[in-house]
Structure formats: structure tokens, C-alpha cells
């Protein structure tokens, strides 16, 4: 059972996640890595606006300061 936020991220490694950012931006992709600051690495990522894909990336790094939530 996950007791801490980083445990949840660890359990979500190599699985699809949705990451909501400040400014109503959203990314969907496979979580490949994270650190204690919640900086995230997503592979096969898509940037979403209003539920529509606006950009695709083979890999993206998201700064933890901008993360509102991560949904596994």
C-alpha cells in the first residue's frame, strides 16, 4: 500500500499518467522517472488543451513546481 506521494509515483512508473499543470495545461504519457521535487519524465507524451491533443513529444521533462496533480 502506498503511504506517501512518492510511493504512488513509484507504483506508476512505466504506466500511462495524466499530469495537470498550472495554467490549465495537461500532459498525458508514460511515466519514466521522477525525483524528490516531483520533476517528471514522460515518454510518448501528448499535450492536451480542452481534452484535445495539441502537441506530441517522444519525451518531455516537466518541472515539479508546475505540477498540480498526477493521475495514474
UniProtKB/Swiss-Prot annotation:
GO terms for molecular function: RNA binding. The keyword Ribonucleoprotein applies. Residues 4-72 form the Sm domain. InterPro entries: Lsm7/SmG-like, LSM_dom_sf, Sm, Sm_dom_euk/arc, snRNP_Sm-like_arc. Belongs to the snRNP Sm proteins family. This is Putative snRNP Sm-like protein. Keywords: Ribonucleoprotein. One of its GO terms (cellular component) is ribonucleoprotein complex. It comes from the Archaea. The keyword Ribonucleoprotein applies.
Amino acid at each position: 500500500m502506498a503511504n506517501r506521494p512518492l510511493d504512488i509515483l513509484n507504483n506508476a512508473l512505466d504506466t500511462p499518467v495524466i499530469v495537470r499543470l498550472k495554467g490549465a495545461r495537461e500532459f498525458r504519457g508514460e511515466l519514466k522517472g521522477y525525483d524528490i521535487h516531483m520533476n517528471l519524465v514522460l515518454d510518448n507524451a501528448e499535450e492536451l488543451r480542452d481534452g484535445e491533443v495539441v502537441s506530441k513529444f517522444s519525451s518531455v521533462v516537466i518541472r515539479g513546481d508546475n505540477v498540480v496533480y498526477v493521475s495514474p
